[in-house]
Amino acid sequence: FANTIRLLINKVREWKNKQSS
């Protein structure tokens, strides 16, 4: 479960980075 949350946060962070660019 914790692994899934970490993966989700990672994706969100990547998405935010792409949006920022």
UniProtKB/Swiss-Prot annotation:
Which residues are annotated with the PTM Serine amide? S21
Report the GO terms under cellular component: extracellular region
Q: Which domain of life is it from?
A: Eukaryota
**Tissue and organ distribution:** Expressed by the venom gland.
Which key words tag this protein in UniProt?
Amidation, Secreted, Toxin
What Gene Ontology terms describe what this protein does at the molecular function level? toxin activity
Q: Indicate whether Secreted appears among the record's keywords.
A: yes
Protein transport is among the record's keywords: no
Task: State its location(s).
Answer: Secreted
Family as reported in the entry's similarity comment: Belongs to the cationic peptide 04 (cupiennin) family. 09 subfamily.
Task: Write the protein's name.
Answer: Cupiennin-6b
Organism of origin is Cupiennius salei
